[in-house]
Amino acid sequence: MSFVFPSWSTAFSPAFHEDAKAMLEGALNKGDKPPVIQGKIEVVELHMGEQPPTLTLLEIGDLSIDRFRGILRLGYQGDAWLEVRCRVQANPLSHNPHLTFSTLPLSTPLLASQPLLVPMTLRLSKLHLRAILILVVSASKGITLVFKNDPLQNVDVSSTFDSVEVIRGYLQQEIEGQLREMFREHLPGIIHRLSQKWFSGSGVGGKVEMPYRDMSPVPSYAPINEEVEEEENEENHGTSPGNEESFPPRHIGPGGITLPLNNSVSQLAALSYSAHTLSPYARGHEHIAVRSFPYLGKSGAGTGSSGRASLASSSVGEGDIKAKRKRIFRIGKSKEADEKSEA
């Protein structure tokens, strides 16, 4: 089973970007940084890109109303990018403070023993991920994510010092090491803290909230009642089309997945039961055309003594069924008496 993420480019609001940038900044500044980086690492820009990741469900370990546990395969090779800003120490003498000046050849340009801090901008793009992960979703505890292998396959690192080949290779190696540690140690905690903002309440009655997605209010449709529907149709028979209430069309993503309505379960139940009827009238559903047919059960022995006709002999698609000749039955008179009276 695979999953498709519809509308990936518009699924994240500015509030999500601000929270994600703050958590990424805290994760990058946590722990020991390379000695060449001085000061605080600032996350300047975060863009989720246009191409969504792919998830393939491999195994379901636990499935209930408020809990899911499974093993999935994650794949991503999109156009997301991250830009950070920091200060690096450009003075080579500061890396080895025990080095004496007598061991260095003196030349015209002298090197300073004080550290020289140079601002640098890093841009991470062309991220390629492939991993097997264990996903646990709980309505009360949030989302727990564990990678079973190293997800990072490749990343493109560009910086202010791309013209210097030695510095470029050094930064590529250091950033890849920091990203591998972040995916292993810090990213599961970031996703868990973000998921706790999405879920509110506890247990089965908990309500799931998505504060980061900008969604317009969607009208809810109540279950269809035939009597109320007929009365409304009779009252609105003479109204003009301009007075009817119109709703905007539903947004359909690139994967063909529509956002569910608030009363979608009732609509699916009504649609399922609409075929189990002998009524010639079809229930009205948005974007769905339904035709009611009589129930075709097992064929019986024809017309029984009780006068019930078998519907199994009728077939759909053979053309219109011609109406039979109307028969008149009179109680208390025989057929011969009727012919004599008519003569």
Swiss-Prot record:
Its main location: mitochondrion. The keyword Mitochondrion applies. InterPro entries: Mdm34 (IPR027536), SMP_LBD (IPR031468). Keywords: Lipid transport, Lipid-binding, Membrane, Mitochondrion, Mitochondrion outer membrane, Transmembrane, Transmembrane beta strand, Transport. It is a multi-pass membrane protein. It comes from the Eukaryota. Residues 227-255, 300-325 are annotated as: Disordered. The keyword Transferase does not apply. GO terms for molecular function: lipid binding. It is found in: Mitochondrion outer membrane. GO terms for biological process: mitochondrial genome maintenance; mitochondrion organization; mitochondrion-endoplasmic reticulum membrane tethering; phospholipid transport. Residues 306-317 have a biased composition (Low complexity). Residues 1-196 form the SMP-LTD domain. One of its GO terms (cellular component) is ERMES complex. Lacks alpha-helical transmembrane segments, suggesting that it resides in the membrane via beta-sheet conformations similar to those predicted for other outer membrane proteins and porin. The SMP-LTD domain is a barrel-like domain that can bind various types of glycerophospholipids in its interior and mediate their transfer between two adjacent bilayers. Component of the ER-mitochondria encounter structure (ERMES) or MDM complex, composed of MMM1, MDM10, MDM12 and MDM34. HAMAP family: Mdm34 (MF_03105). Belongs to the MDM34 family. Component of the ERMES/MDM complex, which serves as a molecular tether to connect the endoplasmic reticulum (ER) and mitochondria. Components of this complex are involved in the control of mitochondrial shape and protein biogenesis, and function in nonvesicular lipid trafficking between the ER and mitochondria. MDM34 is required for the interaction of the ER-resident membrane protein MMM1 and the outer mitochondrial membrane-resident beta-barrel protein MDM10. PANTHER family: MITOCHONDRIAL DISTRIBUTION AND MORPHOLOGY PROTEIN 34 (PTHR28185:SF1). This is Mitochondrial distribution and morphology protein 34. It comes from Cryptococcus neoformans var. neoformans serotype D (strain JEC21 / ATCC MYA-565).
